[in-house]
């Protein structure tokens, strides 16, 4: 049973005076926000293997994961970085959003480290053959790349990592504790059409196997 809290989320209410609740950031933190990459930013990017990409479009906002070998986000110069778009679910919300609104944000996580790197900027989609070749992985060449003009870059403290225990081995989830892909597909099929044939256990296991293979091997 879920309580409907829609009104709580949608009702704006009176404006909250945030400055009365939160202290101003320290001067050193404000000065740490730069409009271009420094050598230490580039050092982190050379080791970066995962980030979340936030974009906005006519239909709303999206956040999408991006991953690759260390350095898959290439530094083109102190104001510009680029990364490839590799196969996913083909929803391509981020790409469509960037065609309507070029603003984006990137949040980098570094395995084992308690620090984040953030980039706010503007992105454009490129099909430049030379750039795509530079961003290729093995025998895979991306169809498109996103070129980012950096407006802001900063390192962000990793308190959230410690609050969550993200890198702690004891925090790793037991896969059996949550529904499988096959089980969720079966439920979604019934939610979309109650008259549709239900997926049996064998079909659910087939979906699980297909997903497990795809996320590990169909990378490029």
Named regions from a protein language model:
Residues 1-220:
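Binding-site signature for planar aromatic cofactors or substrates
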């Amino acid at each position: 049973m879920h309580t409907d809290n829609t009104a709580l989320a949608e009702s704006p209410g009176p404006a909250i005076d945030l400055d009365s609740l939160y202290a101003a950031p320290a001067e050193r933190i404000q000065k740490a926000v730069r409009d271009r990459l420094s050598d230490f930013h580039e050092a982190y990017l050379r080791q970066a293997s995962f980030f979340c990409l936030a974009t906005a479009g006519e239909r709303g906002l999206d956040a999408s994961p991006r991953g690759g070998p260390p350095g898959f986000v290439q530094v083109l110069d102190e104001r510009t970085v680029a990364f490839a778009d590799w196969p996913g679910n083909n929803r391509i919300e981020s790409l469509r959003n960037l065609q309507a609104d070029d603003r984006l944000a990137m949040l980098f996580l570094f395995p084992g480290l308690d620090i984040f790197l953030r980039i706010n900027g503007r992105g454009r989609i490129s099909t430049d053959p030379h750039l795509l070749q530079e961003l290729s992985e093995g025998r895979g060449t991306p169809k498109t790349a996103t070129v980012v003009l950096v407006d802001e870059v900063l390192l962000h403290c990793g308190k959230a990592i410690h609050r969550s225990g993200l890198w702690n081995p004891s925090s790793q989830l037991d896969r059996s504790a949550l529904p499988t892909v096959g089980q969720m597909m079966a439920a979604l099929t019934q939610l979309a059409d109650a008259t549709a044939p239900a997926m049996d256990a064998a079909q659910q296991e087939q979906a699980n196997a297909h997903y497990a293979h795809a996320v590990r091997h169909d990378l490029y």
